[in-house]
Amino acid sequence: MITKAIYPGTFDPITNGHLDLVTRASAMFSHVILAIADSSSKKPMFTLDERVALAKKVTAPLKNVEVLGFSELMAEFAKKHNANILVRGLRSVSDFEYEWQLANMNRHLMPKLESVFLMPSEKWSFISSSLVKEVARHGGDITPFLPKPVTKALLAKLA
């Protein structure tokens, strides 16, 4: 049986924490779509096309992972791609409340859409794209937190 899961997010930029979760999800499901939200309201540093390109580059070794951009409701995107599982990462208890609300809204919009929550590996549990960008803006070392092509792209954006 093919199980298709979606791992949605803004991924601005994709971090080693995101890569850890998508790698683990790819071992659990037949097909994983890394769905990158347009999120223009968040004013991302990278364009949607740039985020998709970076994610494709760093997930290339994961043969069952597909990277797509989207701008519609997640439930609509899931229906369009015949997926009924959402993978979400939970770094802390504070993430849970927001994720719980999203999961319930998505289930309301698409009753067969299940949310699966994964804990990050301990070494990535404190990482977020926003935090990494802030460290980079102040000249801190971001190399431990991002795949090499992403580090290069982020430093180029800030130059």
Curated annotation (Swiss-Prot):
It catalyses: (R)-4'-phosphopantetheine + ATP + H(+) = 3'-dephospho-CoA + diphosphate. Keywords: ATP-binding, Coenzyme A biosynthesis, Cytoplasm, Magnesium, Nucleotide-binding, Nucleotidyltransferase, Transferase. The lineage of its organism: Bacteria, Pseudomonadati, Pseudomonadota, Gammaproteobacteria, Enterobacterales. It comes from Yersinia pseudotuberculosis serotype O:1b (strain IP 31758). Transmembrane segments: none annotated. Its EC number is 2.7.7.3. InterPro entries: Cyt_trans-like, PPAT, Rossmann-like_a/b/a_fold. It holds the Pfam family CTP_transf_like. Its cofactor is Mg(2+). Substrate binds at residues 10, 42, 74, 88. Disulfide bonds: none annotated. This is Phosphopantetheine adenylyltransferase. The record marks 18 as: Transition state stabilizer. Homohexamer.
